[in-house]
Amino acid sequence: CIYGSVQYNSTPDNNLLVDGFLAKQFFDEIPTAPGTRVYVTEQVTDVTSNVLSGVTPSTSGIDRYKMIEANRKSLIADCESSGNHRCGVSSFHQGLEYFLIKRLEVRDVRLVYAPATSIGKYGGDIDNWQWPRHTGDFGFYRAYVGTDGQPAEYSEDNVPYAPASFLEVSAKGVEEGDFVMGVGYPGGTNRYRTTAEVENEFEWYYPQARDFREDIISIINENSIDGSAARIAYESTLASLSNYSKNFQSMVESYGKSDFIDRRTEAEANLVEWINSDSDRRARYAPAVGQLEALIDSNHAARESDLVRSYMGYATLPSAAHRLYRLAMEKQKPDAEREPGYQERDLRRLRQSMQAISRRFDETVDKATLSYLLSRYAELPEQYRSQATDSFFGISSNIDQGQVDQVIEDSYALTSLSDEATRLAWLDSSVEEFEASDDPLIRYAVLSYAERMALELESKELRGQFQRWRPEYMEAVIAYNRSLGQ
């Protein structure tokens, strides 16, 4: 997160990415990138019964998804009533439990220190995700609050935030054999995925996603000069792409050297045998095993198109157009019925993301990225392509990349979305204004909206089905492990 703010504050004449940054006094600290926040977890509450209220075993996939989402949004709205908290509902044990996490949202965050590239990115990513790592990859923010101790917008009168508790950093240094601990905020885990999912992840998804990332890295580098404004605009993106490309590659290599899939296959077979060895267990858990297996097979059928669509967001301006039009559509609904990301609680973030584009976008790079992504999209079977996308860009099974590139060129020449004031104005525009626009990228967003929503509806139906069966499968895993004394 530090790197994004360093990039945002860098220019060719004042390249903090290369030179580093140090605020020797409080007043030397500089604002971070728009939307930067510090979150302090204050409370974690089990809300499983609240989230699953009204849900029954016979509830359809889409209805289950909608009911759980509505219950989540209601809990979050109550939790955020003070105006100073950002709350979320997270599922644990694959949806077997749900917890409401209440976090203080500190909005005035300033950059204090960032190392020079020669320290912070020493050696590149060659030893990233490995131990030991010979890189000074760290930085410092300072969080500020109002004089009353409550979160506030940026002001010179604000004071440093004082947490209720903290760890002291020793100035004594370390010695051979000292205890070392890695500290991090809990994220997610895939350790309870099925053998079929694990195999797909390591043998298909990670290699494919790595290649996508490496290709986009090459496109950015080929279309921007090192140290130029264009390259600086994408340094944070490059770091993110490279970070997970290395992660995926390392996991694939480790997987190939291990007997992991054999052990996972054996463990899953033992679980199924344990379930089937008892009539009560078979009645309780066997349906979940079978249904989950069928859902996974169904989900894998569209994996290529899902992957391509997941990377389309790297084309900045078309992505912005889609988000802006989606906002206009969502604003027609009561706030509680809007899609997460488009509620009133999200509008400040959405505005800040539109502002940030001004320092994280270059037209040449964006056009080249979109050209690449559409070339990958065109490789999909016709049934997985969008009629609106095919029509707008002139894509068919026999793609003429030159023709597609000309459509891209013409669209970027005529769009005004590269202008920040225009993007911000669209935030307050009506559906009718979008539909009447002659901006080509806005027109594309309008034309493709119905198909995008149809795909989203299919995805929600599938997610609702997973929400039905994953918790029962997880319940079986827990019961089996307990039978082994684990």
Predicted features by range, described:
Residues 1-486:
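Terminal presequence/propeptide segments associated with secretion/organelle targeting
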